[in-house]
Amino acid sequence: MTRTASAPRSVGSARPLKAIYDVPAPAKLNLFLHITGRRADGYHLLQSAFMLIDWCDTLHFELRTDGQISRADLSDPGSPGCGAAEPLPAEDLAVRAARALQAACGTSLGVHIGLEKRIPSQAGMGGGSSDAASCLLALQRLWGVTLPATELRALALSLGADVPFFLSGGHAWVEGIGEKITPIALPAARFVVVKPSAGLSTPAIFSAPELKRDTETATIQGFAANAEGQVFGFGRNDLQPVAQALCPPIGQSLDWLSAQHLQGRMTGSGSAVFALLPHDVDLSDVPGTPGDWKIRKCSNLQAHPLAGW
């Protein structure tokens, strides 16, 4: 069973609002990820197709008039169909996003953030970045403030390379260090996502000498020219060979997908992997994963639940 996005609920008729509940923060999958170069400052240049899926965290925001920013873990390990809850770090990206927006807008208002964390950490699914983006969008409404779009994108990029994507409203072709975002259309599709229990460090992957950093530049036109089902098999993930060497369970999870006659690929810097679920394969045909791996049958979203905010 997949946790789907729900419509946010606002409380309070006067500005600013008193609270906004049930704010979704969807995960992403990288359909491919190419490293095309490296800047003088050490940042890697990439090309990727980012796709939103219906595996979501949920955030709740309650206004504080004392200017303080607080946060609570509302994850319930016993929620049916949702699996084990993800623990929150001491200071997550949602809190950092709230503080950054508060400073940028000069508001004296604060917020209490409740976070139901479901997207796995160290998965390459952008959970923390998505939380930050949803926080930026919701707090502009809660506090009655608005940053110009260019300033909001710059603030988002300062929080993390994936955060601007989650502000873009839908699937996207992403280039540079994450700041060049072009909307793309993708056909509706279902996927199996597998997250082995082990995670790994993103810096360890990018610092590996054997990482391929010179993949030929692709084009959106070349990507879109593929037949409908083939866009989900375009290119490769340049991080995957290094990640598999550092984290053997990634290879094991890919082998498991292959045993189900599914072509798997790692998303982002891992350790989650995914495969397209053909239309003629019933969900009940996909068995559970070994041990404490997490598995979800997900659908891609045609738009971010907060598109237009």
Curated annotation (Swiss-Prot):
The keyword ATP-binding applies. Pathway: Isoprenoid biosynthesis; isopentenyl diphosphate biosynthesis via DXP pathway; isopentenyl diphosphate from 1-deoxy-D-xylulose 5-phosphate: step 3/6. One of its GO terms (biological process) is terpenoid biosynthetic process. Keywords: ATP-binding, Isoprene biosynthesis, Kinase, Nucleotide-binding, Transferase. One of its GO terms (molecular function) is ATP binding. Pfam families: GHMP_kinases_C, GHMP_kinases_N. InterPro entries: GHMP_kinase_C_dom (IPR013750), GHMP_kinase_C_sf (IPR036554), GHMP_kinase_N_dom (IPR006204), IspE (IPR004424), Ribosomal_Su5_D2-typ_SF (IPR020568), Ribsml_uS5_D2-typ_fold_subgr (IPR014721). Its EC number is 2.7.1.148. The active site is at 28, 162. The keyword Lipoprotein does not apply. It catalyses: 4-CDP-2-C-methyl-D-erythritol + ATP = 4-CDP-2-C-methyl-D-erythritol 2-phosphate + ADP + H(+). ATP binds at residues 120-130. Catalyzes the phosphorylation of the position 2 hydroxy group of 4-diphosphocytidyl-2C-methyl-D-erythritol. NCBIfam families: ispE (TIGR00154). PANTHER family: 4-DIPHOSPHOCYTIDYL-2-C-METHYL-D-ERYTHRITOL KINASE, CHLOROPLASTIC (PTHR43527:SF2). Belongs to the GHMP kinase family. IspE subfamily. This is 4-diphosphocytidyl-2-C-methyl-D-erythritol kinase.
